[in-house]
Amino acid sequence: MRSDTIKKGFEKAPHRSLLKATGAISTRDDYSKPFIGICNSFNELIPGHAHLQELGRIAKEAVREAGGVPFEFNTIGVCDGIAMGHVGMRYSLASRELIADSVETVVEAHRLDGLVCIPNCDKITPGMMMGALRTNVPVIFVSGGPMSAGHTPSGKTVDLISVFEAVGQCSTGEITEDELQTIEECGCPGCGSCSGMFTANSMNCLCEALGFALPGNGTILAADPRRNELVKAAAGRIVDLVNKDVRPRSILSRQSMLNAFALDLAMGGSTNTILHTLAIASEAELEFDFSELNDLSAKTPYICKVSPATTEVHIEDVDRAGGISAILKELSKVEGLLDLSAPTVTGKTLGENIADAEVLDRSVIRSVEEPYSATGGLAVLYGNLAPNGSVVKTGAVSPSMMKHTGPAKVYDCQDDAIAGIMNGDVKSGDVVVIRYEGPRGGPGMPEMLSPTSAIMGRGLGDSVALITDGRFSGGSRGACVGHVSPEAADRGPIAAVQTGDMITIDIPGRTMSVALDDETIRQRIEALPEFEPKIKKGYLARYARMVTSANTGAVLTTNF
């Protein structure tokens, strides 16, 4: 065992003395058992994580019952909703790398034999996965579970995005401040990851398709008693995975990545999942090109539409309809789409995991013969504005905006864009351009939920598009194109756009372009001053110097 490095032999007496002092060692027999890290992300700032302390306790009990010795440790976490719309959002994506580094550090420093990872929200799940793949010790994931949707006294179903969009409605006088307060107080009714197919729930669902989590991980509600049982079952599996030396890199493959992307496309997951899955592939040293997503999308039907793409369906409805296993079972009917032989942490193949699954509500999970669309709910757009690609959540775009041409309204930061939208500078037909908000320019590639919600709230969702080198919340909806690469800070073409330039977005054609010739773009970029970093000290200054492009997952470079 790896942990023998810190516990075996007379020369390790000091190490054993320290281990005994933790209280985790009951008898000397424990030194012959595998040491299992319980990587928890409990904190009291994130509603999706406020309940994880109890799940950690359940996991530790299950590991002991299975014959292991558990050691719980924590990672940090950022609530994207609370960090939204101010300087705090610059730390959100950057926190993913801190989490990956912290997992690597604890596992390697203490020679742990295996890991039970308990994440829940946006950057925590991919961060833990990146760290686990880096160390390549046996691992199993079990999330904290989704929040239930809220309900107003009038019976209207609401979620966090309802609150964000209500701010825009209040600014136009469509609703009163009292009505806004009602939505505010009902939008997030309890613990759990926010209740739509936003980034957190998307990633926790993808864990099932990747093979790293038990069925139910992505959809069983946080407050459902079955969540505690799932934690117990998952933690109970880790000792067997350690004993059989089942490592994450033996589970993650190109095939399992394609399975996860197919699921993502079929349920219209967050655009952030592309960013995170590319980063996960990078840690596993798997080659996956941005452009492959369009090829996969062409044969993946969009069969499960969940908030924010609709206000009628939330994650709890997906769970009731059969969960992720039912979606995968339906997708397995498309010849050659899924690799059902992919291994998983259950000890069975993906095909075996979903063999008994069935769709229990066709209003939530459609058949592949009658999808919402024949192609997936995400797409990569290329063109002279995004030579290296950009991403759009097609499933959340209204039919009238699938093709759009309009004049650019350019803002060099998100705050200016929000002000422009709220004060009426943005008009019907415009294409809002928010730049210098990419991985390096932001820094941290902040999410644009506030401006997209303002656009929707002010009734412009069917007439205004938004493009950015930043990214979007999983809760964003509308004609929102993000991850534009190269970013403005790297002198990408988006830096050449001026207010009034005509921009065409053609989602079915997978293109996005500005009506400028190459020479004009080149001349405008040459005339620009060198990019001046916004933050010059602390973690974000270091992050900005090391981060790579969005089209490769915005991972940190190790080439110096």
UniProtKB/Swiss-Prot annotation:
Binds 1 [2Fe-2S] cluster per subunit. This cluster acts as a Lewis acid cofactor. One of its GO terms (cellular component) is cytosol. It is an enzyme of class 4 (lyase). Its cofactor is [2Fe-2S] cluster; Mg(2+). InterPro entries: Dihydro-acid_dehy_C, DihydroxyA_deHydtase, DiOHA_6PGluconate_deHydtase_CS, ILV_EDD_C, ILV_EDD_N, IlvD/EDD_N. Keywords: 2Fe-2S, Amino-acid biosynthesis, Branched-chain amino acid biosynthesis, Iron, Iron-sulfur, Lyase, Magnesium, Metal-binding. The active site is at 473 (proton acceptor). The keyword Amino-acid biosynthesis applies. GO terms for molecular function: 2 iron, 2 sulfur cluster binding; dihydroxy-acid dehydratase activity; magnesium ion binding. It catalyses: (2R)-2,3-dihydroxy-3-methylbutanoate = 3-methyl-2-oxobutanoate + H2O; (2R,3R)-2,3-dihydroxy-3-methylpentanoate = (S)-3-methyl-2-oxopentanoate + H2O. One of its GO terms (biological process) is L-valine biosynthetic process. [2Fe-2S] cluster binds at residues 121, 194. Its EC number is 4.2.1.9. The modification N6-carboxylysine is found at residue 123. Pathway: Amino-acid biosynthesis; L-isoleucine biosynthesis; L-isoleucine from 2-oxobutanoate: step 3/4; Amino-acid biosynthesis; L-valine biosynthesis; L-valine from pyruvate: step 3/4. Mg(2+) binds at residues 80, 122-123, 447. Belongs to the IlvD/Edd family. NCBIfam families: ilvD, PRK00911.1. Functions in the biosynthesis of branched-chain amino acids. Catalyzes the dehydration of (2R,3R)-2,3-dihydroxy-3-methylpentanoate (2,3-dihydroxy-3-methylvalerate) into 2-oxo-3-methylpentanoate (2-oxo-3-methylvalerate) and of (2R)-2,3-dihydroxy-3-methylbutanoate (2,3-dihydroxyisovalerate) into 2-oxo-3-methylbutanoate (2-oxoisovalerate), the penultimate precursor to L-isoleucine and L-valine, respectively. Homodimer. HAMAP family: IlvD. This is Dihydroxy-acid dehydratase. It comes from Chlorobaculum parvum (strain DSM 263 / NCIMB 8327) (Chlorobium vibrioforme subsp. thiosulfatophilum).
